[in-house]
From Swiss-Prot:
Domain Fibronectin type-III: 450-558, 566-661
UniProt-listed GO biological process terms: axon guidance; compound eye development; cuticle pattern formation; homotypic cell-cell adhesion; maintenance of protein location in extracellular region; segment specification; smoothened signaling pathway; wing disc anterior/posterior pattern formation
Coiled-coil regions listed: none
Pfam family of the protein (one): fn3
Organism encoding this protein: Drosophila willistoni
Name of the coding gene: iHog
Membrane topology: Single-pass type I membrane protein
Protein name per its UniProtKB record: Interference hedgehog
Glycosylation sites: 75, 98, 194, 201, 282, 349, 381, 430, 455, 517, 548, 686
Cystine pairings recorded for this chain: 60-122, 167-212, 266-314, 358-407
Amino acid sequence: MSSSSSSLLLMMLLLLLLLLTSKLEAIPVLSSTSPSPGVRILRSSESIVAPLDDEVVFECETSLPPERFEWSYSNTSSSSSAISSSFIYLSSVAGKVNISHEYAISRLAIVVRPESLGEYRCVGWFGPLVVTSTIARLDLASISLATKKESHLNWRTAPGNSIIWPCGQQVQANPLASWSFYKNGKEIQPLNHNGTLILNNISSESNGVYSCMATNTASGVRLPIPSSMELHVTKQEGSKSPYLLFGQPTRQSVTTREGQRLLLVCPGVGSPPPIPVWSSPNVTAAVPNKRSKLLSYGLEINPVQVEDAGIYICYLDNGIRPPLELYINVRVEQAPVIVQAPWAGSLTNESDRLQLECQAKGEPKPTIYWLLNGKRSHEVNQSQLLSNGRYLVLKKVLKEHAGYVQCFARNHLGEHSAGTLLQVNPKLVNETDLVVSRPQRPKKLQIMVPPSAPNVTRLSDESVMLRWHVQRNEGLPIQFFKVQYRLINEGKRKMWQTTNENIPYGKPKWNSALGKNFTASVTNLKPQRTYRFRIMAVYSNNDNKESNTSAKFFLQRGSSLEPMPVPELVKIDEYSETAVVLHWRLSDDADEQSITGYYAYYRPSSFAGEYSKATIEGAKARSFHIGSLEVGTIYEFKLQSFSADSASEFSALKQGRTQRSKLTTTEQPIQQKGGDRNVNTTPNHNETYSLNPLLTGTIGGGALLLLLLIAFSFCLCRRKNRNGGDGRNSQNKPRLAELREDFLPLAGGGVPGSKQRQRSRHIHITLNPLDQQQQQPLDEKNTNTNLNSPHLEADPELVYFQRQQQNHPTTYDYDHGQRRLSSSSLRRSQRTLERTPGSNNNLQQIGSETTTTGQRVILKRPRLSSRSENLSSGSLNSVGV
């Protein structure tokens, strides 16, 4: 392998690693909206006017099926704005009413009698939470005359004028009556408005006697009016200024409801016929506008609005002085509407002070009252009303206050309501310390403090999100949590199901002075079913304790729900090496009051597992700090808003990273010569050299790979050179057969009559004749010493050889330059000896023919290790074993 190919391979590997570790941009993900139904009354009952002995049905519908429906009743005599406090609950047992329920709809059927007239409202129970509908009245249909005084009018006027006859002024009807008009006893279809006959551009054909009749639309009762008007249309000589006919008023007062059609008539005749001109001193842009229409006999406003109320002046002018002025006072009534609904936030601590505000508009000004779980505010402990009911103050929030708080605005036109969910975070109850038997040494026993009941939020058609809280306490530490749920149905009671996931408690320190919050999701649920949930905590003593169960939760399908605002993740700031800060916003048309908080999901971008979750309380939050992240790592984030009953779809996916680790080299400040002597050249924070840990590892790995390639190339070159040199020096190497002949075993395997040592610690083997002559005296001395030693014993592993130089003369070339080879060469020689067939047998045969006496006696192990021999060309030198 050449150095150029190694460099090319290294460059390609480095380029590939740099491409893989490059910074990824944020990937936009299309998202849709998700519903948020809420627990509320979808459709309240409407007031009904019915005749006696008729049967009427009140109906109300809730957003979710409640545990039960109830109807309450108050016997009030009028529809005034006064609030009744004497509501009683009705029952079908008495037989006077018939109550039926179907899914989330309840119906109340009742017969109209004097004792059944009054106000009704529907109540839905969702565990401890109670939702109440607005009031619906049941009134008896009626029609009557305000006065029985007869009126017969006789009018004469010139042709071309408009005649306006208020026939229905003396009629009182509930509901409003319908009118029929007659001319000379025959019914006609003229213009009319609320009992007022209008004859436009009269002529001689308009002569006759006119009368009217009122009909009650609910009961069908017809009421003849004892009044009539006889009209004579005659041509008058000369001119006459505008004037009023007998019985026509100069001032009028008109009351109407917002959204209806308003007709202001301007009675008066003249010769020639006058033309009306309209103005108003206190109504801005009253005439003309897009909703007004000028007529020859009046002014029409459709639809009328509250700002149209005021004084209107009609000027009748036909060119002859003086003109006629008519004043009309217009009053526009408006049903109550709540413009600022109360909002209790996500969680209220027990014993805190809570103030809720409710603003409403209407004409007449509505009265405001409050209900907390169906109870009037004066029946609730620690409650107080301020500013005529605009504010509800809970001076000290109690656990019994948890539930649904509703604000009602009421006038004689009806009611309007808005509500908020009040969640109370209870205080930790300090249990009495348990003391052991000896009073002088009281011992506190740690208790198992259970988690709070979970709050349930819908995530999808098959999953929910649970949120719970653990109070700050001194009890046993919690190791992890388990989620349990149970299906609620009408039949057999279902068993609790436990999820497989162990939800870790985390670090044993508190997030705040109040405790720690936790979230977990439950999947594989069935839509259109009702569930209950609870949290089981497992403690350090391996015991467990369950929380209180949640309220019943109906998992509704998303297709039938209204959308909820989806937050937009704007940017992600690198806060520190282990933390980031998320920033988001809502669209301009988003309903912030429908949001309880947000869920933040995050995971490393290179990780395809589950997301970690964090809960952000409060609808007004627009940023959040996420810590305990990895240094210099890219994460992907997404958000979703949630309420007490649902969650939105996820926001678009966005990526961000934590800060890289900083490798800082600090230099001593250098004072500049000349002008400024206090200039500090130490690099500041922004100039600190820092490397991405992943990039640093890549460079280090590349350098290591380069070193390995260089070492590998060097080894190949050394091996190639060694192979070439071995061929040239092969003639100096001894043959194995000749090498075996140099070693002859002693007969009997030992020295007769003498004990041998078990194993010699030093073995000297030499074939060099020069060394042999030098070592022979010393070897003979050592041999005699060993043979005479009483410690020598027979050892089958030891073999004694004697070299027979006289019988087997062998010549070796001696080279001082190659006395010692590497250990690898020795190992190869040893393996060659071991693989030679019959080598040991040949040695033994030769040894048997040799006498036990010789010039040399050498201790030789059967198998030589790499440390025991050094083989050179022509010499075999022994080393210490």
